[in-house]
UniProtKB/Swiss-Prot annotation:
Pfam families: Ribosomal_L16. The gene is rplP. Keywords: Ribonucleoprotein, Ribosomal protein, RNA-binding, rRNA-binding, tRNA-binding. Part of the 50S ribosomal subunit. GO terms for molecular function: rRNA binding; structural constituent of ribosome; tRNA binding. Binds 23S rRNA and is also seen to make contacts with the A and possibly P site tRNAs. This is Large ribosomal subunit protein uL16. Belongs to the universal ribosomal protein uL16 family. One of its GO terms (biological process) is translation. InterPro entries: Ribosomal_uL16, Ribosomal_uL16_bact-type, Ribosomal_uL16_CS, Ribosomal_uL16_dom, Ribosomal_uL16_sf. GO terms for cellular component: cytosolic large ribosomal subunit. It comes from Rhodopseudomonas palustris (strain TIE-1).
Length: 137
């Protein structure tokens, strides 16, 4: 699973996801992509599950680019622990995803297989997504 090799700080504030994606909103590498339509925090496990669904349906043909990276630590207190006494320890890593962000891109397969693969990947994610394709040149 993806996580940063090192960070400046161990814990982070929760924060909010405002506005729409300005960077990363268009296809940059592949011919087809999966675009987020809702703001959400996507966990490293969800990204990995979507990646596996993609590569397995494509039968390892073509190329996959993951355009989001989980760089935000989420802390959690252990079960049955009373409130207070500080913030919990880091439990998982998430990526903040804004609406309009292209999360996955693929190339080297035809449009039908790409659409099926990205639909399977979208089922692993907790947000509404849209299939996007580069206009034929």
């Amino acid at each position: 699973m993806m996580q940063p090799k090192r960070t400046k700080f161990r814990k982070a504030h929760k924060g909010r996801i405002h506005g729409v994606a300005s960077s990363g909103a268009t296809l940059a590498f592949g011919q087809f992509g999966l675009k987020a339509m809702e703001p959400e925090r996507i966990t490293a496990r969800q990204i990995e599950a979507a990646r596996r669904a993609l590569t397995r349906h494509m039968k390892r043909a073509g190329r996959v680019w993951i355009r989001v990276f989980p760089d935000l630590p989420v802390s959690k207190k252990p079960a049955e622990v009373r409130m207070g006494s500080g913030k919990g320890s880091p439990e998982l890593w998430v990526a903040r995803v804004k609406p309009g962000r292209v999360m996955f891109e693929i190339d080297g397969v035809n449009q039908q297989i790409a659409r099926e693969a990205l639909t399977l990947a979208a089922a692993k994610l907790p947000i509404k997504t849209r299939f996007v394709a580069r206009i034929a040149e």
